[in-house]
């Protein structure tokens, strides 16, 4: 494309000295770095980002109401943001997932992991031949048609379902959307396979895109700790950890969640895998309250899985989230038999691994128990983290031996 035919984009001019993160190829521009916008740009529209002297730095999407004023599509000045751009990004991402799916025998995985796959604000999960789309930023929404066209080019047989019904869209002035985009409607419960397990996924009504694919490897790792053990599975959702624990030979697994619908699917998942349902108990309750009740009644477990939802959405909530994580892990530690195993996780991006480890150490002190860290977890390999965007490493976890 020649200079004369190349699209002319509005220019976002940065304040002096605020270009360093872009020079290190971080994909976000925060409001405090912005000097002015030259030209007019609608919500989500493509803009060029330049330093205070006009030197070109990147091309991204404009979001005037967000603290993240721009999200970078490309650091290549010769790259236009069009259907061909999205097709290239999708094919690049698919190469890694194809290899991984063949190696691990997967029929479901994360195809696009936002910024780490060069598509900020875009999440795409594959469940069989269904692609579940979440557009979380203004730029992603603005490019919806181009992205869907690229998806159809890369996988013409896929059925696309939109799950952009997440509250974070409101922060950038967007309505929540959900429904079929192309192809057939997903069934109420779609069976997938994961490490020898069959699991039912609720694409239309489940959490996020229907299932937490990021915990795939952690669910598998659970099996080494549970043989002949009594297991407590907190925040169980649809029972992936419970099924894995039963496949690992546990004596009993108690799954706790506030959603009866999720617990009903968890029960179906146990039955689907022809596992002993008498070893599985399903409790609808608040985890904090139930753990305190178990402590009062002297209940004990050999393994506790603690996989709570995100406790922190922004920095102002971090201190409160730290207290929540400490309290819940303290209660879990108190309920474990000597030598018991705590498998504990945080999916909060603002919670670093070092901080999470310190919280568990503080919880152990408050519980009056010694704890050994014996294994560390992170999101599965279909959720890569690009080196210039450490925020992409949002899921962290530890296996702890409680003395």
Curated annotation (Swiss-Prot):
It comes from the Bacteria. It is found in: Cytoplasm. GO terms for molecular function: RNA binding; rRNA (cytosine) methyltransferase activity. Its EC number is 2.1.1.191. Residues 9-88 form the PUA domain. SUPFAM superfamilies: PUA domain-like (SSF88697), S-adenosyl-L-methionine-dependent methyltransferases (SSF53335). The keyword S-adenosyl-L-methionine applies. Its main location: cytoplasm. The keyword Transferase applies. Coiled coil: none annotated. GO terms for cellular component: cytoplasm. Keywords: Cytoplasm, Methyltransferase, RNA-binding, rRNA processing, S-adenosyl-L-methionine, Transferase. It catalyses: cytidine(1962) in 23S rRNA + S-adenosyl-L-methionine = 5-methylcytidine(1962) in 23S rRNA + S-adenosyl-L-homocysteine + H(+). InterPro entries: PUA, PUA-like_sf, PUA_sf, RLMI, RlmI-like_PUA, SAM-dep_methyl-trfase, SAM-dependent_MTases_sf. Belongs to the methyltransferase superfamily. RlmI family. Specifically methylates the cytosine at position 1962 (m5C1962) of 23S rRNA. This is Ribosomal RNA large subunit methyltransferase I. The lineage of its organism: Bacteria, Pseudomonadati, Pseudomonadota, Gammaproteobacteria, Enterobacterales.
